[in-house]
């Protein structure tokens, strides 16, 4: 690596940390944290003005993780740690239904609004509790995280507990990949055989069933044995999801001393996803593709959302660290420069979430039920650490 490349990485690391500490965390501490009821609001306008007091249960967990991770990785700020605990307390007090399944949205005070057929609320609650346990040394919260993980697994394996989304039998990408991350975060604070088993099982399923060699992609849903479901939904490629999966697997490969098989899987998925996802005309990672080249059914198919760009920045750094191949450093620079040219709000802080294909802002709000303090701060923390580590 040249001195110029090392300098570039150090400058990126400094920028990411500075943005986290001076912009993103203060934005959400000021505009999102609910100091009356606990937890966090995410439905805020461009300048942070609260638009809707409905609370995303996903984001109670996501913010619980983010604030504790920022404390662990960047700065021992007690206010961040208190904010993490507030979100976790809000989840435990208000967000779990009588059957043990968490809600999707609740009111400001915590009354139920909506419940969905997934266990993503649980997944984010689990990583919040684990990260808080890491910050505080709390054995209690490490065990709570494991109990939430076990509850997720029970719900997923109990026939009829989670109403199926479709009558089509098959396997989904989302839950398979997210369980890698959940188990990996929990492994840092508690030793339980089922966590390693989950990571291995998810990666095996991705390799065996979801990776499609013919179309060179990971598909969002496949048949029970990995068959292509030849419908619009079955042909859907979500490049951002694929890149996120790639770096989850590369992170695990790294934890295992750059395990050769896992490294190969992660790099392959990243390379495929970049080929499908990067928009050669306008730049940025596009939302959806169809593996047969038909127009994707989703109306946001050609938009540029904030989170795939975040995943591309992290993913390219993991690939570069794994290989030393300069092409990945060049891809990181492309993803970084595009994101900072189009998504970063240099006037009012934080990032826009939704852009048209050409990179122009589709709507300026900084948050809603799906966007809040998670993908951007996670990228800033992780990319800062990776860039600094690689540049040594």
Language model regions located:
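Glycan-recognition and catalytic cores of secretory/periplasmic carbohydrate-active enzymes
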Residues: 1-392
């Amino acid at each position: 690596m040249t001195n110029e490349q090392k300098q570039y990485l150090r400058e990126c690391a400094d920028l990411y940390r500075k943005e986290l500490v001076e912009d993103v965390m203060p934005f959400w501490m000021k505009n999102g944290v609910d100091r009356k009821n606990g937890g966090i609001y995410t439905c805020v306008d461009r300048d942070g003005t609260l638009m809707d007091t409905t609370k995303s249960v996903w984001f109670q967990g996501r913010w619980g993780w983010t604030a504790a991770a920022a404390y662990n990785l960047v700065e021992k700020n007690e206010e961040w740690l208190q904010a993490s605990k507030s979100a976790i307390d809000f989840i435990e007090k208000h967000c779990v239904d009588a059957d043990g399944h968490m809600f999707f949205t609740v009111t400001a005070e915590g009354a139920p609004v909506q419940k969905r057929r997934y266990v993503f609320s649980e997944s984010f609650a689990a990583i919040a509790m684990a990260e808080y346990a890491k910050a505080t040394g709390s054995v209690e919260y490490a065990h709570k995280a494991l109990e939430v993980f076990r509850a997720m697994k029970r719900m997923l394996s109990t026939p009829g507990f989670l109403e199926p989304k479709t009558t089509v039998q098959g396997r989904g990408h989302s839950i398979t990949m997210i369980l890698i991350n959940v188990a990996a975060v929990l492994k840092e604070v508690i030793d339980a055989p089922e966590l390693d088993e989950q990571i291995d099982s998810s990666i095996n399923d991705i390799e065996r069933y979801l990776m499609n060699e013919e179309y060179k992609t990971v598909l969002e849903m496949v048949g029970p044995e990995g068959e292509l479901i030849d419908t619009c939904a079955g042909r859907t490629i979500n490049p951002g999801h694929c890149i996120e999966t790639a770096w989850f697997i590369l992170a695990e490969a790294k934890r295992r001393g750059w395990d050769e098989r896992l490294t190969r899987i992660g790099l392959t998925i990243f390379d495929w996803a970049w080929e499908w996802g990067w928009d050669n005309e306008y730049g940025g990672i596009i939302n959806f593709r169809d593996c047969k080249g038909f127009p994707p059914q989703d109306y946001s198919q050609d938009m540029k959302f904030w989170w795939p760009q975040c995943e591309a920045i992290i993913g390219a750094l993991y690939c570069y660290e794994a290989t030393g191949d300069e092409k990945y450093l060049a891809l990181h620079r492309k993803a970084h420069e595009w994101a900072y040219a189009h998504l970063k709000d240099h006037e009012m802080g934080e990032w826009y979430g939704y852009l048209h294909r050409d990179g122009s802002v589709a709507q300026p709000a900084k948050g809603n039920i799906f966007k809040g303090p998670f993908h951007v701060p996670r990228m800033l923390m992780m990319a800062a650490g990776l860039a600094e580590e690689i540049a040594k």
